[in-house]
């Protein structure tokens, strides 16, 4: 799939991945922050200072997004045009019904009771495990360099469900 906008991986000079090492993100951020810090351009022209400020802001935003697993996934989906504002994306009916039933049962539950709370946490954990199992093949394909529509839709569905 084609990329629709600049991505934060390029800005931090990191490989595009859903599983970027936090240490690599931090190192790239510090290196680029020092290199593009506006104070280094205090003697330069207004244009140079403004460019440094904008670059610094972009580096900060890239660090924030790539450091958060959920924001990183959303960013990748945005890059590939998989999250279009106001686009109607339908999730499987069975999944939506299951979530409605779970929400209703949670609302009716006494979460102050430790036993009930443990049961609820177990159900949530089970749903999360099922989602991870469902998306794992798509994540592997993405990490192996596949960016076709089917792979990106599988990742998008996981993102929307989680």
Model-derived regions, located:
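C-terminal accessory/regulatory regions appended to core domains
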Residues: 1-162
